[in-house]
């Protein structure tokens, strides 16, 4: 097999989300339909506590420089969607809170190139108990979650079933 062929073949660990699971993130919506997402941040750069301390508990989510994640910001996230806030590069790595999209995708003001997008997020609630990556990986019903399958992305969709499972694991939070 040539290197070119190998590069085009889907990884057995990372299913073809563009044609499968991720396609739902871009599908037409019913009126009032709310979708769910996950964003990652290193807590020493910007934490959920920082979001809670921000004016109106709101911030612009900028600095994303990955095309797949940019597409979720630009074309997937809509006002009213709910978002898990995940602390990456932390000990432990965990989902710690829930946010809401309050402004849909717009050109990222921190970027020199207008191809990059940002959204505005507002804190909704801190989870009563953080849900760690280890706990997520231990749950068979979360095995296909984008966080587990393609953990490098800083913005990913979350299915309704994944959302409900994690909210229950965190003991608190609106749907």
Locate each region found by the language model:
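Charged phosphate-binding loop/patch that engages nucleotide di/tri-phosphates or the phosphate backbone
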Residues: 158-175
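Structured loops at beta-to-helix junctions and adjacent beta-edge loops in soluble globular domains
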Residues: 40-42, 124, 158
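Compositionally biased, charged N-terminal/linker segments
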Residues: 2-78, 173-175
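Short, charged beta-turn/beta-strand-edge "cap" motif at the junction between a beta-strand
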Residues: 86-92
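Aromatic- and Lys/Arg-enriched surface recognition patch
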Residues: 94-155
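Short, acidic Gly/Pro/Ser/Thr-rich loop/turn segments
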Residues: 44-46, 128, 165
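Short, charged, solvent-exposed linker or helix-capping segments at domain edges/interfaces
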Residues: 50, 130-136, 167-169
